[in-house]
């Protein structure tokens, strides 16, 4: 659920609107390998490590836009946000969608913007990947 919390953080930072241009738990690349025809930002997480009460997830922020210049600027803004501002957060929350908080956040830097897929018209799905260490709020697990 840290992907939802990241999605809410991106909404609060002005990157889009949840459910319209910001999505979590789905992918712009379909199981057939084809690409969705929607524009927007997708956030997904995979747990890569657990050490006691400390979790490490890899977050993927993907985008697909018809305008490649708009997409390029967006990805640069996202990269700058992840590497220069996200580390200032000590808590990420899923509110108001779900009452789940992630505390003691530590963000590892993102190092690249990757191309994940190309649609039938040559438009790209691009992604930024980075790791986040966190603990669950005690209220979340009760």
Label the model's feature ranges.
Residues 1-8, 66-77, 131-142:
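Short N-terminal helix-initiation segments at or just after the protein's N-terminus
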Residues 59-61, 77-81, 142:
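Generic alpha-helical propensity signal that fires on short helical segments
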Residues 65-94:
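Extracellular/virion structural assembly segments
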Residues 84-131:
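Acidic-leaning, charged glycine-interspersed low-complexity segments
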């Amino acid at each position: 659920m840290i992907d939802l919390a990241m999605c809410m953080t991106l909404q609060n930072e002005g990157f889009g609107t949840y459910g319209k241009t910001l999505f979590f738990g789905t992918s712009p690349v379909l199981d057939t390998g084809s690409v969705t025809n929607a524009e927007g930002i997708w956030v997904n997480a995979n747990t890569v490590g657990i050490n006691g009460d400390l979790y490490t997830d890899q977050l993927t922020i993907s985008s697909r836009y018809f305008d490649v210049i708009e997409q390029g600027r967006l990805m640069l803004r996202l990269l700058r946000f992840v590497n220069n501002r996200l580390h200032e957060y000590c808590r990420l929350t899923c509110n108001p969608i779900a009452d789940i908080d992630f505390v003691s956040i530590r963000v590892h830097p993102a190092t690249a913007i990757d191309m994940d897929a190309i649609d039938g018209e040559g438009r790209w799905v691009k992604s930024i990947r980075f790791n986040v260490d966190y603990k669950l709020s005690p209220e979340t697990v009760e």
